[in-house]
């Protein structure tokens, strides 16, 4: 009994438009075959290598390697650990960048929520933490202290303790430092 599946011949690899020598020198190749004009004049071996561009795979090859999507499949789950910041903030204005790296959704806060003299920043950060934490975040959590470290006036720490305590006691009228604490001379 004969197999009804058509036999496909393998495609010949696609060659580069420019020869390897002109490509390496980043010069325009005249694409002459079997040798381009530049290679002939310089006495070089003219080779047209395989193209590095793969192109689009054929449609039937795509469907064979990937299962069909199931209804209600929203894609792979997001890994929120991959959103972390690459460096500590360098100024007060970078607080939103830090928080958006730590908390998905913090980037939605306006710049006014993070500037000096802000009164709603603390509540916004606690709200975001509570939304994305598996358990509601305690107000004195050390993770919150690390978010606010460097943004509150240093004199407040001596009187009230942690940044979280300062923010809680101030009730939304927390004085902010013009420069992060870590940048102030000791």
From Swiss-Prot:
Pfam families in UniProt: Zn_clus
One GO biological process term: positive regulation of metabolic process
Entry keyword set: DNA-binding, Nucleus, Transcription, Transcription regulation, Zinc
Coarse class of the protein's main subcellular location: nucleus
Annotated Gene Ontology cellular component terms: nucleus
GO MF assignments: DNA binding; DNA-binding transcription factor activity, RNA polymerase II-specific; zinc ion binding
Keyword tRNA processing among UniProt keywords: no
Residue ranges: DNA binding: 19-46
Leader sequence segment: none
Subcellular location: Nucleus
Listed Gene3D superfamilies: Zn(2)-C6 fungal-type DNA-binding domain
Coiled-coil segments on the chain, per record: none
Chain positions covered by the region annotation Disordered: 52-98
Described function: Transcription factor that specifically regulates the expression of the pgm gene cluster that mediates the biosynthesis of cryptic naphthoquinones derived pigments responsible for the coloration of the fruiting bodies.
Protein's UniProt name: Transcription factor pgmR
Originating gene: pgmR
């Amino acid at each position: 009994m004969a197999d009804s599946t058509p036999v496909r011949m393998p495609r010949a690899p696609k060659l580069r438009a420019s020869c390897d020598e002109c490509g390496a020198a980043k010069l325009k190749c005249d694409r002459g075959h079997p040798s381009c004009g530049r290679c002939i004049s310089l006495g070089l071996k003219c080779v047209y290598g395989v193209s590095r561009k793969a192109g689009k795979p054929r449609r039937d090859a795509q469907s064979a390697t990937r299962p069909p999507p199931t209804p209600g499949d929203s894609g792979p789950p997001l890994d929120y650990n991959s959103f972390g910041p690459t460096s500590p903030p360098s100024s007060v204005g970078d607080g939103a960048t830090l928080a958006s790296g730590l908390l998905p959704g913090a980037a939605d806060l306006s710049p006014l929520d993070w500037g000096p003299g802000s009164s709603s920043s603390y509540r916004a950060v606690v709200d975001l933490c509570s939304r994305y934490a598996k358990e509601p975040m305690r107000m004195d959590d050390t993770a919150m202290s690390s978010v606010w470290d460097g943004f509150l006036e240093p004199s407040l720490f001596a009187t009230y303790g942690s940044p979280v305590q300062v923010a809680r006691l101030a009730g939304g009228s927390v004085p902010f430092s013009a420069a992060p604490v870590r940048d102030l001379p000791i």
